[in-house]
């Protein structure tokens, strides 16, 4: 594997290449087809990892104009069969199904890969897709650990003909864009501090018992780049992997990534200079390893400060919202909840502006309630592929925002504040423990 400094050098080269989404002004090239995808061409999509979010993405992409979901991949045949049936019921066409991601990426039957696998797979799958000549939609977080962010940027810089974006879909939601314009345009004066949060009331995952691997699951493929475990436990999958160090990244990257990304966007900052975290697994005594209660704070030099509060087991709202971001300025506050709306409050807390939209969540859509909003983000990716227009969420921005939250998790696990180079994102004079968490061990043969 390359050294971290080599990652950073490659990331700097990637910045210019990725800032506009594509270097091809008349449409991006996909080596899958070997031709330019033009403004009116069909884009063939393959989706990998379809148990939950991937099923929602596949269903939503299948409804897009000039798009066909042609390939589906999952190493659990139950998830694969369910998704294949869903797309067939929507479109009348049954996509090709793959259990093995290697064979999926080799297929010439799709141009663009949508990656919605568990977190430990994100960077590996994105790199495989780029190397196979696929455009990439990478669900958040962009990676499992900071070193993988640099590796993704290194690989993306080698393929300027391909368009890679990330699932930070709120960067395309109209009223979120308008709210950031308010913040950065001076509507509340200079902003020096912003906070973000996520609340839920998740149950215990209990103490797992060793059981046989389900016959429908290829457990080796599911583990992929992660070091192997000796036993399969009944509380590992499909969602609980989020809470284990080996595969997941905790609530901070499961949901915090979305809102720290908005925070960073509004403040106009990149890497911090200092990161601290407090918290722990407080609510239940079970196998859940990441915190269920966490407060991460960021110092961005003399420019600004920010924070993220995560409460996985106490859903009491903050400022009326279960999730959100608040920007505090000299003359008031811009407040965003989880949907496509925002408020401006004066210094006494009175609402002086409330922007809403008919584009909102659809409770009746049980597969993807935010589908209409998410499809705006998908359209932006497709436009970048077809015409080279700018991405709303570049992979560079996604990697930086992901890394901010990863740095908070490192501080949490080492139990100490960490200093960060604000230009490169590297740790400054790190402890051996912090350095070890900047990267990870890989299963032999599965390295990036």
Across the structure, where does each feature detected by a protein language model lie?
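N-terminal glycine-/serine-/threonine-rich beta1-alpha1-beta2 phosphate-ribose binding loop
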Residues: 1-138, 147-163
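Generic alpha-helical segment signature
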Residues: 50, 172, 371-375
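Structural recognition of the beta-strand scaffold that forms the well-ordered cores
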Residues: 44-48, 69-73, 114-116, 137-138, ...
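Short, solvent-exposed turn/loop segments enriched in Gly/Ser/Thr/Pro and often Arg
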Residues: 76-79, 98, 118-122, 142-145, ...
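A contiguous active-site-proximal alpha/beta segment in oxidoreductase catalytic domains
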Residues: 135, 143-221
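Conserved G/P- and acidic residue-centered "switch" motifs that form tight phosphate/ATP-binding loops
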Residues: 140, 186, 388
């Amino acid at each position: 594997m390359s050294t971290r400094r080599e990652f950073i050098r490659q990331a700097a080269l990637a910045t210019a290449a990725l800032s506009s989404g594509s270097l091809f002004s008349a449409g991006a090239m996909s080596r899958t087809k070997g031709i330019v995808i033009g403004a009116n061409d069909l884009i063939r999509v393959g989706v990998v990892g379809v148990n939950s979010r991937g099923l929602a993405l596949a269903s939503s992409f299948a409804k897009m104009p000039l798009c066909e979901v042609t390939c589906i991949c999952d190493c659990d045949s139950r998830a694969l069969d369910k998704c294949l049936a869903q797309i067939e019921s929507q479109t009348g066409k049954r996509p090709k199904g793959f259990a093995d991601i290697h064979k999926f990426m080799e297929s010439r039957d799709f141009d663009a890969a949508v990656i919605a696998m568990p977190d430990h797979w994100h960077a590996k799958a994105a790199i495989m897709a780029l190397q196979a000549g696929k455009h990439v939609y990478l669900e958040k977080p962009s990676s499992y650990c900071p070193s993988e962010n640099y590796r993704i940027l290194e690989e993306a810089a080698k393929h300027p003909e391909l368009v890679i974006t990330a699932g930070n879909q709120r960067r395309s939601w109209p009223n979120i864009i308008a709210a950031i314009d308010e913040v950065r345009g001076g509507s509340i004066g200079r902003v020096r501090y912003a906070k973000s949060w996520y609340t839920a009331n998740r149950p215990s995952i209990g103490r797992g018992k060793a059981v046989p691997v389900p016959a429908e699951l290829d457990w080796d493929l599911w583990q992929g780049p992660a070091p192997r475990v000796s036993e399969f436990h009944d509380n590992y999958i499909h969602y609980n992997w989020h809470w284990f160090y080996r595969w997941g990244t905790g609530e901070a990257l499961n949901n915090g990534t979305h809102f720290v990304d908005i925070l960073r966007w509004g403040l106009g900052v990149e890497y911090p200079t200092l990161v601290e975290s407090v918290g722990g697994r407080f609510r239940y005594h079970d196998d859940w390893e990441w915190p269920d209660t966490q407060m991460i704070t960021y110092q961005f030099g003399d420019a600004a400060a920010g924070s993220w509060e995560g409460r996985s087991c106490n859903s009491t709202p903050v400022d009326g919202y279960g999730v959100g971001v608040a920007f505090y300025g000299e003359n008031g506050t811009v407040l965003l909840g989880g949907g496509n709306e925002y408020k401006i409050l004066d210094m006494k807390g009175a609402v002086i502006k409330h922007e809403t939209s008919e584009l909102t969540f659809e409770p009746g859509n049980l597969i993807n309630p935010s589908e209409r909003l998410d499809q705006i983000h998908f359209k932006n990716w497709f436009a970048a592929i077809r015409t080279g227009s700018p991405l709303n969420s570049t992979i560079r921005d996604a990697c930086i925002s992901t890394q901010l939250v990863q740095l908070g998790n490192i501080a949490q696990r080492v139990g100490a504040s960490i200093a960060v180079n604000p230009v490169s994102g590297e740790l400054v004079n790190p402890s051996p423990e912090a350095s070890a968490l900047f990267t990870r061990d890989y299963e032999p043969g599965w390295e990036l």
